[in-house]
Regions:
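Conserved motor-region signature of P-loop NTPase helicases/translocases
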Residues: 1-47, 187-192, 196, 201-331
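Accessory N-terminal region flanking or inserted into the helicase ATPase core
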Residues: 1-4, 99-199, 206, 231-235, ...
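Conserved P-loop NTPase-based nucleic-acid remodeling module centered on helicase motor cores
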Residues: 28-146
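N-terminal low-hydrophobic presequence detector
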Residues: 38, 59, 172-175, 326
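Non-catalytic, well-ordered alpha-helical scaffold segments
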Residues: 42, 46, 63-66, 70, ...
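Short, surface-exposed, charged/polar-biased interaction segments
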Residues: 69, 83-93, 114-118, 141-145, ...
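General structural signal for alpha-helix termini and helix-helix connectors
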Residues: 74, 78, 164-168, 313
């Protein structure tokens, strides 16, 4: 069963699934997993432990996609392959460029540029995250016109040479999720229980394939997505809307039952109204709840001083620095 829980920010999606996990733990029902983005995993684990209590680890766990890969590796083993660290990856990229630089039309100069080597490594990571192999990238290069096709062809050559430099006896971090996708059918994970997914706007190509594999394995799956409506609505939520439609389509194609639950926000906040109408230049007026303030300043310097003073004031009142953001158009 695939269940989508949708609603605007503050509607209570996260609170609902955490309460469901808490109730399952209190009834001694195991097999609950909360899948969240890597950067949110520690905070989610702390919050879930606060809600569910000290018995939580017996019945539920919080994982990122990388954490799920580690869990499956612990179950099935690594096959004797040793992971390559960051320094080793850079060395392998340098070796890869040495082997193919004479065939490169755009990135031949990267052979003597450590900075460009790092950028090529990031490009290889992006392609791997999207589920592209060197062969598929070369096929895309043949269809792309002009300079774009040449760049993709170079990336395909570099990608193939990089994986050859890594070798079969080592594993690369960029291929970790692809390896997880390949080995997941052998694992017991997801054959029962309930998988909750929260904190995502969309998924990479490999992550989406993993979700499709998981929803077909027997465990129930609940995905929380922040959006106003599934059919149409604000452009702000378009990415989440496409993700929801894709998940429902994949479930339908696999014969997996699905349903959508929409949670209404408890109250409309000024911040929500600002997010909805900030760029629409409407003449509508709204009552403020004193959470949004509009200031004018004589200069950019004065604007910066005001922003800095407000940030310091918030920090001194107990707000964490990491919860304060300064957004600018351009200076």
């Amino acid at each position: 069963m695939l269940r989508l829980i949708t609603g605007r920010a503050g509607a209570g999606k996260t609170a609902q699934i955490m309460d469901e996990i808490r109730r399952a733990a209190s009834e001694h029902e195991g097999g609950r997993c909360l899948l969240v983005p890597e950067q949110y995993s520690h905070e989610a684990e702390r919050e879930l432990a606060r809600v569910a209590g000290p018995s939580l680890p017996l019945y539920a766990e919080v994982l990122s996609f990388t954490g799920l890969a580690r869990k499956v590796e612990a179950e099935l083993g690594t096959g004797g392959r040793r992971p390559v660290d960051a320094g080793g990856r850079l060395l392998c990229m340098a070796l890869a460029l040495d082997s193919v630089y004479s065939r490169l039309r755009i990135y031949a100069g990267a052979r003597r540029s450590p900075e460009l080597q790092g950028q090529l490594l990031a490009a290889v990571d992006e392609l791997s995250a999207a589920g592209f192999t060197a062969e598929q990238t070369m096929e895309a290069a043949e269809r792309a016109p002009g300079a774009l096709g040449q760049k993709l062809a170079d990336l395909a050559l570099v990608m193939g040479a990089f994986h050859a430099a890594i070798g079969p006896e080592h594993s690369d971090a960029s291929d970790r999720l692809s390896e997880l996708l390949r080995r997941l059918p052998e694992s017991s994970f997801g054959r029962s229980g309930h998988i909750y997914i929260d904190g995502f706007t969309d998924f990479t190509g490999v992550e989406m394939k993993l979700l499709c594999e998981l929803m077909s394995r027997g465990a129930d799956m609940t995905v929380c997505l922040t959006l106003d409506a599934l059919d149409e609505g604000s452009e702000v939520f378009e990415l989440s809307r496409r993700t929801a439609r894709r998940l429902l389509r994949e479930a339908r194609e696999r014969g997996v039952p699905s349903r959508v639950e929409t949670l209404e926000a408890r109250s409309v906040r000024s911040a929500d109204i600002l997010a909805e109408h900030m760029l629409s230049y409407t003449e509508q007026h709204f009552d403020s709840d004193n959470s949004v303030f509009l200031y004018t300043a004589e200069s950019v310097t004065a604007e910066c001083e005001l922003a800095a003073s407000r940030a310091i004031e918030l920090a001194r009142s107990g707000c964490r620095w990491r919860d304060i953001a300064v957004a600018v158009r351009s200076f």
